[in-house]
Amino acid sequence: MEISKKAATLLPKPFYVLSQALNLSNKDHTKWWYSTAPMFATMMAGAGYDVHAQYKFLCIHREVIIPALGPYPEKGQPMHWKSHLTRFGLPFELSFNYSKSLLRFAFEPLGSLTGTKDDPFNTQAIRPVLQDLKAMVPGLDLEWFDHFTKALVVSEEEARTLLDRDIEIPVFKTQNKLAADLEPSGDIVLKTYIYPRIKSIATGTPKERLMFDAIKAADKFGKVATPLAILEEFIAERAPTLLGHFLSCDLVKPSESRIKVYCMERQLDLASIEGIWTLNGRRNDPETLDGLDALRELWQLLPVTEGLCPLPNCFYEPGTSPQEQLPFIINFTLSPKSALPEPQIYFPAFGQNDKTIAEGLATFFESRGWGGLAKSYPADLASYYPDVDLQTANHLQAWISFSYKGKKPYMSVYLHTFEAFSAAAQEVAMCHDGHNP
């Protein structure tokens, strides 16, 4: 059956071809495909990815990622598992680096036992997915994954103890997730993110201490001892508003991997963010100060409710568009090449007006002379969700990351990735099933 010309002009050819060629017999897999693949395909095509890379990444998405996303969320039905990845508990998210025209995705692998008494904190689903990816990603190395998982993820014995003692567990239970940088040429770099919250509750050890001790144990030759010591000192200075949150590392051999410590900052004002950017004055080189000027400019363009921000303690239902102010997230890269930890600032966009944010980003991108998808950002965002009014929506953009490298801003936008292009995708799905659109 032919697809209408209208739908055919909306979505890239690789999406259509694979929708016809891939096995879409599983109901949940099919729904995840038509919910996430159209936006995935559109962003790759718009960024000029090699067509072979587009097919490769979409095939990996269908064959490895989608089977690990669990049951598809249905309105009015309780979700199988709510992931800390998004405010809706959805386990998949796309992001785009507008400085490098680089697409990324992140997901929390879910399994059939996730959330049951046999795997109450979803610690078991991630390894089978990594084994599948190992066959597809040359250079994938699990040494640091194994190390940090053992140090920061709750063990089976600890999980049983938590349940047996009926200890109160927070709503955010995610232990780990995976992310991938997708190069336009077809190469992939995988990363893992590990959350020590439940381990901290089980052991009585603060999250920061768990992460710092795990890093010291991994850093056998003390290559990042200096920036780590400064980070420990800095976080202590910023207490109680700067809180340790989670840790990430690249899944490559340890000598080439980066370690990042993520924190939440509750004190939302420009002076607070300036202090984080300069590490309370420790970073004062010309590039840092140039980056500070750009950061101040971005601050003026994005909506922030200033003051002491409460920590989130709930998920929202998909299909809603709530208003809220989230804390900032900061990551600090620990590198042997720098004596100081290098901060990256994440502006919370979720809960703020999407049109205001999109226009602010467009102004900032234009002032930098960025082309490609940066040039068409507001129009592209609106096109992903044609049935959503940006003037009243607060949920299409989740985070905006900012750092400064090579004398220019380095920025990514993390986007709501659920039922984009819904009308066009539904038409393709109906044609695949043999129904008239």
From Swiss-Prot:
Keywords assigned by UniProt, alphabetized: Alkaloid metabolism, Transferase
Protein name: Cyclo-acetoacetyl-L-tryptophan dimethylallyltransferase cpaD
Pathway(s) served: Secondary metabolite biosynthesis
Top-level enzyme category: transferase
Annotated function: Cyclo-acetoacetyl-L-tryptophan dimethylallyltransferase; part of the gene cluster that mediates the biosynthesis of the fungal neurotoxin cyclopiazonic acid (CPA), a nanomolar inhibitor of Ca(2+)-ATPase with a unique pentacyclic indole tetramic acid scaffold.
GO MF entries: transferase activity, transferring alkyl or aryl (other than methyl) groups
Disruption phenotype: Impairs the production of cyclopiazonic acid and of its biosynthetic intermediate beta-cyclopiazonic acid, but accumulates the intermediate cyclo-acetoacetyl-L-tryptophan.
Residue numbers binding L-tryptophan: H84, L85, E93, Y195
Keyword Transferase among UniProt keywords: yes
Catalysed reaction, written as an equation: cyclo-acetoacetyl-L-tryptophan + dimethylallyl diphosphate = beta-cyclopiazonate + diphosphate
GO BP annotation list: alkaloid metabolic process
CDD domains in UniProt: PT-DMATS_CymD
Entry similarity comment: Belongs to the tryptophan dimethylallyltransferase family.
Binding residues annotated for substrate, in chain numbering: R104, K191, Y193, R258, K260, Y262, Q344, Y346, Y410, Y414
InterPro entries: Aro_prenylTrfase (IPR033964), Aro_prenylTrfase_DMATS (IPR017795), DMATS-type_fun (IPR012148)
Pfam families per the UniProt record, alphabetical: Trp_DMAT
Keyword Transferase: yes
Source species, domain of life: Eukaryota
Organism: Aspergillus oryzae
